[in-house]
């Protein structure tokens, strides 16, 4: 298997710089979010601040931040633009078999996936269009 860039219908590129895939993949994370958090996740300012101040960084990637009570699932901003490795895909399949079919942001959380990271540089943002999971 090969790593994949996943872009949902509402992802839009904002960076003119190419995504440094090799560097991001060398960070060791299974799934890496590339979305800016503003408008994509609750407590987006806290998310952004925690990502930017995190010192345990490898190749511009940090662990997905904790922004709320540990009982609340927390992961990558928006879940609409991310890089997933074969190990990350296997983990998601395993979690789906274990917990059932849920939207990806319910399973793709730091409480269930230790190797969930985000880039400090944001390459995409969400477009403000109608969701396909909350019709």
Locate the predicted segments by residue.
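An acidic/histidine-cluster motif and surrounding catalytic segment
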Residues: 1-7, 11-135
